[in-house]
């Protein structure tokens, strides 16, 4: 088990920062395997992410229709795994109605190998990510990873990377972002810095909205943009308080449009997006990893865990069968 300092637990009741809780373990596993793994072929913004619905059946989505990607569930972290990836156009950027001007080298192989612990560059733009990854590894390697945790985290990744774009589901249900997203949320990644503000409060609101927008991108792209923007660098050097953390996550989820879907489908998608966003925030904050994982654990317990347990647990709301978990 990883120990935390008093500073790590600032603003977090101890019971919400329990490294043995299912929420904490899911976030830690997801952060390590689906955010910090900065292999270009896996998480490049130009990566083709698979679609969960076929061209012939772009109707309402279901937990059963989420694309099955070969990710580790039962086996040890040290064994070599194969992750099969499709070649279709990325749906994630389309879902969030954003554009990326920065070109990345195309990823040629259809099948790539992921190995754990995953190697991360120790220099340049990945240096900060390496520090965070090391912190997560210490937590995960201190005890065996629960196969249930691995399956849940991997299912979250499947949902996040397989979501159909809004033009495919616009009139037939399916999650997307509402048409009424405030214009302030739409920033060109290569555009100018945040505009001057009349007050400190306006400046804070702009920074928060900027972070919300950037959370829609891949982890590597997010890291690059944070380093480019002096205002964002400043806020993350100081560290996020839980109240700001919660505001960012709330805004990120607020405009997800799941009208026409069942409560379980809608909440399952929002829970997956929340885990993805929280994991990215842990990657870019300068405070110890346990502190941010504690924030995420607290947030999930406040807004998702009670409902999840009332509806059969994480496996059920994410569409996992007993055979996949056992």
UniProtKB/Swiss-Prot annotation:
The modification Phosphoserine is found at residue 44. The keyword Cytoplasm applies. A motif (BH3) lies at residues 211-225. GO terms for biological process: apoptotic process; positive regulation of extrinsic apoptotic signaling pathway. PROSITE patterns: BCL2_FAMILY. Plays a role in apoptosis. This is Apoptosis facilitator Bcl-2-like protein 14. It comes from Rattus norvegicus (Rat). The gene is Bcl2l14.
């Amino acid at each position: 088990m990883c120990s935390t300092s008093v500073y790590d637990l600032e603003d977090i009741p101890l019971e919400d920062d329990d490294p043995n809780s299912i929420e904490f373990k899911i976030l830690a596993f997801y952060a390590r395997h689906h955010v910090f793994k900065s292999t270009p072929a896996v998480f490049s913004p130009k990566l083709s992410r698979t679609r969960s619905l076929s061209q012939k059946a772009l109707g309402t989505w279901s937990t059963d229709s989420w694309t099955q990607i070969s990710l580790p569930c039962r086996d040890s972290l040290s064994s070599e795994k194969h992750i099969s990836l499709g070649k279709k156009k990325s749906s994630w950027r389309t879902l969030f109605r954003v554009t990326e001007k920065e070109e990345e080298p195309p990823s040629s192989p259809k099948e790539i190998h992921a190995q754990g612990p995953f190697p991360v560059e120790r220099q340049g733009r990945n240096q900060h990510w390496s520090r965070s990854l090391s912190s997560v590894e210490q937590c995960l390697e201190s005890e065996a990873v629960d196969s249930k945790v691995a399956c849940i985290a991997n299912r979250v990744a499947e949902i996040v990377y397989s979501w159909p774009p809004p033009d495919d589901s616009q009139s037939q249900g399916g999650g997307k972002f509402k048409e009424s997203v405030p214009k302030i949320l739409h920033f060109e990644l290569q555009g100018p810095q945040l505009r001057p503000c009349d007050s400190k409060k306006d400046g804070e609101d702009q920074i928060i909205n900027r972070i919300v927008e950037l959370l829609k991108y891949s982890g590597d792209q997010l890291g690059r943009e944070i380093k480019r923007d002096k205002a964002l660098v400043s806020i993350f050097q100081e560290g996020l308080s839980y109240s700001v953390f919660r505001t960012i996550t709330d805004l990120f989820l607020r405009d997800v449009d799941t009208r026409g879907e069942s409560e379980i489908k809608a909440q399952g998608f929002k829970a997956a997006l929340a885990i993805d966003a929280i994991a990215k925030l842990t990657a870019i904050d300068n405070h110890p990893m346990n502190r941010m994982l504690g924030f995420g654990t607290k947030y999930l317990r406040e807004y998702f865990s009670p409902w999840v347990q009332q509806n059969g647990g994480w496996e059920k709301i994410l569409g996992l069968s007993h055979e996949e978990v056992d």
